[in-house]
Amino acid sequence: TLMNEYKDKIGEVIIGYYQRERNGNIYVDLGNAGKVEGYLPVKNQSKLEYYEKNDRIKALIVDIKPTNTGIQLILSRSDKKLVSSILEREVPEIGDGTVEIMSIVRDAGYRTKIAVYSKREEVDPVGACVGLKGVRIQNVIRELESEKIDVLKWDPDPTEFIKNALSPAQVDRVVILDAEKRQALAIVQDTQFSLAIGRQGQ
């Protein structure tokens, strides 16, 4: 059955085309003679994206529901797994396990921060993700409709990792307040403050 065919595809990326919109929710044509319909609810949409009839939509399958005519795939453009999936395709070093995505934080439509780690010293994880002249990361940005993407080096030392995470802001000092609760204080100059806290203090 279609349900069995697609249930293992949850977490995978699928491509379809904008069909219609109702109350902000988008219905996506996935082919298959209309038996498989894509549904992109408002809550799963990236805030700054706008679609018109027949626009191509690449999205993550997050759930499946039966319908009278077949099945409906619940899609997401805001899930951070969409970013990791696109990145895995663009960066061979992630695909073969040399570079590992350790963490992703995403404010869909605005900015994504990705922490990466290399299992081999001679491979720069950030450079691998960015690519020569930024080609690889530009392909990811294009797929996410120009969302800003920061790639940073993961570090097992929390102090160093926090400094990397707040880059490009210059951090003078990091004080670990509570390691168990993962609370820390980063000290920066006044001129670096807005850069460090990001949009609306994020």
Where are these regions (language model features)?
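RNA-contacting regions in translation and RNA-metabolism proteins
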Residues: T1-Q202
